[in-house]
Swiss-Prot record:
Its EC number is 3.5.4.5. The keyword Zinc applies. Residues 47-167, 186-296 form the CMP/dCMP-type deaminase domain. The lineage of its organism: Bacteria, Pseudomonadati, Pseudomonadota, Gammaproteobacteria, Alteromonadales. One of its GO terms (cellular component) is cytosol. This is Cytidine deaminase. Its cofactor is Zn(2+). One of its GO terms (biological process) is cytidine deamination. One of its GO terms (molecular function) is identical protein binding.
Length: 296
């Protein structure tokens, strides 16, 4: 079991902790598939909603909040039945806008894993306005059920009434809808190919700045992030922050970053290169490889 879970596993009911410990191996990064979730439900003798709330200390253990020292964990349940954990991330000494919220982390985890709809979001503290707006961008966002400790489960519409969202800007394929933007680049570099694939799956209906980041560690592992825009603009999630959140979930240190690539479309109304370099240089002494490509 990873060291970061030792303290929180003691907070769980023993039947649950006994069933969960084998899953918390060196490769665990917050994903529990539907079959494993069913096993945990059976062995813990908890209802699924109770189980998800009980798992929040595990999700919160994925957090890296050096500024606030406030650990927030979130769990997103996808239409597939799988669950995806996420947690807040802050960049030490840097402006707060670089932060990733737990709900963003969990939802981006699900999105990177191929989920096309989130049914439930479970979180240990009430979602802030930023996160409510971020969740509202998703497919059927107003119907996502929010679960909080000692609170009745309620749809997002309860927490964000009279919402402004993608439909107000005539967007018919919101976040988590299948995206496939035609981007092409002649390269045999596996890392650039991976970044290109993720850029083609990014969500940027407002700026058309389709983009992705891939980070490579010294052992050759790669961690990616895609751009996820928001109708309210500010709650958009940048690909570098998503990639750093992915690294954190996998228990990797930013000092292990050996290479960083940003790919973005030349046809976008904005460029993410400045914000991407700021975040990268805050955590690693690596130069950003910036590639601008034309649509196919």
């Amino acid at each position: 079991m990873q060291d970061r879970f030792i303290k929180c596993i003691a907070q769980l009911p023993k039947p649950l902790s006994d069933a969960l410990i084998p899953l918390l191996n060196a490769d665990f990064a917050g994903h529990i598939d539907a079959q494993q979730l069913g096993m945990l439900t059976t062995k813990s003798q908890l209802e699924e909603s109770e189980l998800l709330l009980a798992l929040l200390p595990i999700a919160a253990a994925l957090a890296k909040p050096p500024i606030s020292e406030f650990y927030v964990g979130a769990i997103a349940k996808g239409k597939s039945g799988d669950i995806y954990m996420g947690a807040n991330l802050e960049l030490s000494g840097e402006a707060l806008f670089h932060s990733v919220h737990a709900e963003q982390s969990a939802i981006s985890h699900a999105w990177l894993s191929g989920e096309t709809q989130i049914l439930d979001v479970v979180v240990n503290f009430s979602p802030c306005g930023h996160c409510r707006q971020f969740m509202n961008e998703m497919v059927e966002g107003q119907k996502v059920v929010i679960h909080l400790p000692e609170q009745k489960a309620q749809p997002l519409a309860h927490y964000l009434p009279y919402a402004f969202g993608p439909s107000n800007l005539n967007i018919t394929e919101p976040l988590l809808s299948k995206q496939q933007h035609e981007l092409s680049l002649d390269s045999s570099d596996p890392m650039i190919i991976e970044a290109l694939d993720h850029a083609s799956l990014s969500y940027a209906p407002y700026s058309n700045s389709y983009a992705a980041v891939v980070l490579e560690t010294k052992d050759g592992a790669t961690y990616c992030g895609r751009y996820a825009e928001n109708a309210a603009f500010n709650p958009s999630m940048l690909p570098m922050q998503m990639a750093l959140s992915t690294m954190t979930r996998h228990n990797r240190e930013f000092t292990e970053i050996n290479r960083a690539v940003l790919i973005e479309s030349a046809q976008g109304k904005i460029s993410l290169v400045g914000a991407t370099m700021d975040a990268l240089h805050a955590v690693a002494a690596v130069e950003l490889e910036h590639i601008v490509i034309d649509p196919a």
